[in-house]
């Protein structure tokens, strides 16, 4: 009997208020970590109507010009006119950063050279064979659409587009394999003079049909482009934005569980971020090695403790190996202490602004070391013995 269902994921553009906040937090992190690799950073950002607040905790020896960093991010996104809902030149930027608690730091920086986890927490990694990047198809397509919205705006192909926007893609599955796109929702901020008819036609022709894979397109796709009508007021003028409010967009679009911890603004001693990257690295290499078609990996940590307190691997009935065998392999092949993760993935680099929009996973950029499949052969060798 054929098992058929729909699964939906969403993405947002770099001009979405929550993503603006993520990008500012990660730009602050990058500025600091480039100059002080021993820094501890937990940077949170709020953007609202005409102002930005940067807060959180730092332990660093260098000065970071918060105002300049925030304004440069907002300018790069494209909020260059108050008519867009925010202007990088006139917006107020308030700095409320404080010092990291020494109670936390004593458990992280240890005398034996190891690094304790910066907090307790559980994280998940995921990989599957639905795309070349070993990502779920719905989130992959949703990111392609929002990235294209930004590119078509910036290169002036669709000059009436403005920075804020979202996408949502519903994919039809049969027997756990994606077969077609069912519904596409795109909401995009725009200039007041463009008609909704022209906007919809342009978005479908210039973005959807030029970006999405032909094998999933068909004549019966349901399109909803700005379904409520006009979307002129957007960005922080329309909605406040906060760091860490798009954690499902940042990860797998709901295709696997989420531990609840956000990524942006956190240095890699925070396992919310670094261990989530490691969990993706593990899951992707398991799938790339051929020992399974799909993998969900959970890692859990205790504050100040070096080794993970638990490792869990679920291959969703796509592997001939047991969870216990797979866990044994993972422990042998991967370094999953905070220090091991930081060193093996080379995380003390200013790479985090690249992650802060269009997904932390499934993008094969050179800086994204957790996307490499260089452990696949070791995994194969483990199961040959």
UniProtKB/Swiss-Prot annotation:
Metal-binding as UniProt keyword: yes
InterPro entries: ADOMET_SYNTHASE_CS, S-AdoMet_synt_C, S-AdoMet_synt_central, S-AdoMet_synt_N, S-AdoMet_synthetase, S-AdoMet_synthetase_sfam
Chain spans, region Flexible loop: 100-110
Pfam families: S-AdoMet_synt_C, S-AdoMet_synt_M, S-AdoMet_synt_N
Catalytic activity: L-methionine + ATP + H2O = S-adenosyl-L-methionine + phosphate + diphosphate
EC number: 2.5.1.6
Gene Ontology cellular component terms for the protein in this record: cytoplasm
Cofactor binding, per record: Binds 2 divalent ions per subunit.
Pathway: Amino-acid biosynthesis; S-adenosyl-L-methionine biosynthesis; S-adenosyl-L-methionine from L-methionine: step 1/1
Residues bound to K(+): 44
Residue positions binding L-methionine: 57, 100, 239, 270
Key words of the record: ATP-binding, Cytoplasm, Magnesium, Metal-binding, Nucleotide-binding, One-carbon metabolism, Potassium, Transferase
Compartment(s) of residence: Cytoplasm
Binding site for ATP: 16, 164-166, 230-231, 239, 245-246, 262, 266
Positions with a binding annotation for Mg(2+): 18
GO molecular function: ATP binding; magnesium ion binding; methionine adenosyltransferase activity
Organism domain of life: Bacteria
Subunit structure: Homotetramer; dimer of dimers.
Family recorded in the similarity comment: Belongs to the AdoMet synthase family.
Function: Catalyzes the formation of S-adenosylmethionine (AdoMet) from methionine and ATP. The overall synthetic reaction is composed of two sequential steps, AdoMet formation and the subsequent tripolyphosphate hydrolysis which occurs prior to release of AdoMet from the enzyme.
Name listed for the protein in its UniProt record: S-adenosylmethionine synthase
Species of the source: Helicobacter acinonychis (strain Sheeba)
Gene designation per UniProt: metK
